[in-house]
Design a protein with these regions (language model features):
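Catalytic machinery of carbohydrate-active enzymes
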Residues: 1-314
Length: 314
């Protein structure tokens, strides 16, 4: 069987999304290997697939030449630029890049995403074009065993962090939102990673369960009713499991592309476009967007999501 490699960006969400490509490669007759920084965590979710941590840049040419086809998610990292260079010099000719945004490095055979569609849908269309497989967003994520889908329908998971602090809504607003939701009869649980836990443990009155692995987080999400959070990987995981999501962000343009794209979801963004004055280093959209997304705005978006979710159940 022909062998293929997928080179992912660093986020958990990127890994889940690129598994769409892995499924298409299987349909096209390839045996895929997925390169990702969180290879060990993702392998617990996709037990029948092969994950390998990214190799040192100096080893890329030797390692990737062992594969018949290589699909790369462009993240403008040092690794991606090294691969651009190797391809332009004819050292790695079998590379195909997925470009979320336009780039001078696009070559014939690469795929530029449509910014009006989700990444999940873009990847399914890219694979149809590149591999000739039917367009589908399925990534073969196995559902948790011995768990009940949406068992706790009124349980809301709030994921208040991300891998970029500038993407995070204000902590005090997450807490205010939680109190408001609890008054409406919902059970609210906060979910944070080990590195963020110390900032949240001392807050009185919140539920903050401890999880031993991404697999345990997945199982907990699967039995919950909703997930609310920033633009982060857990939103993609919830959507992948069929759990409705509400994503809070200051960048509507980015979110049109990167919002969770497997099941129903809503977004909460500022009520009007925010500028970035780069010349005077006043990046309002980047650094101050949180001030323009109120608790009431997010709460209303959640009520709309909950109502839509109810309609989908019948």
């Amino acid at each position: 069987m022909k062998k293929a490699a997928l080179c992912c960006a660093s986020g958990i969400g990127d890994g889940l999304l690129m598994m769409i490509g892995a499924r298409h490669l299987k349909l096209a007759g390839y045996l895929p290997t997925i390169f990702h920084d969180a290879a060990e965590e993702l392998s617990l979710l996709f037990e029948s697939d092969t994950f390998i941590p990214h190799v040192p840049i100096e080893d890329l040419e030797n390692i990737l030449n062992r594969y018949d086809r290589v699909l790369v998610e462009n993240d403008n990292s040092e690794r991606a630029w090294h691969l651009f260079n190797l391809r332009s010099r004819g050292r790695l000719k079998h590379l195909t890049f997925f470009f979320p945004t336009d780039s001078k490095n696009i070559r014939e055979g690469d795929f530029l995403f449509n910014p009006k569609l989700t990444v999940a849908l873009n990847l399914s269309l890219a694979c149809r074009k590149i591999l000739g497989t039917p367009a589908t967003k399925e990534n073969d994520l196995p559902l948790p065993k011995d768990k009940t889908f949406k068992k706790y329908l009124k349980r809301i998971i709030i994921h208040p962090t991300s891998n970029d602090a500038k993407r995070n809504w204000k902590r005090k607003r997450f807490l205010s939102l939680a109190r408001r939701l609890e008054k409406e009869g919902f059970s609210v649980v906060f979910c944070v990673g080990p590195s963020d836990r110390s900032r949240w443990e001392g807050i009185e009155g919140i539920s903050l369960p401890r999880f031993g692995s991404l697999k345990e987080v997945e199982e907990y999400i699967y039995e919950s009713g909703f997930l609310i959070g920033n633009d982060s990987g857990l939103g993609h995981l919830a959507s992948n499991l069929g759990i409705p999501t509400l994503t809070i962000s200051g960048n509507p343009k980015r979110l049109r592309l990167w919002r969770p794209g497997w099941t129903i979801g809503k977004v909460a963004t500022p009520p009007f476009p925010l500028p970035n004055f780069k010349g005077i280093n006043l990046r309002i959209r980047e650094n101050f967007w949180q001030n323009f997304v109120s608790v009431s705005r997010v709460y209303q978006a959640f009520i709309e999501l909950a109502n839509e979710s109810c309609r989908h159940m019948f």
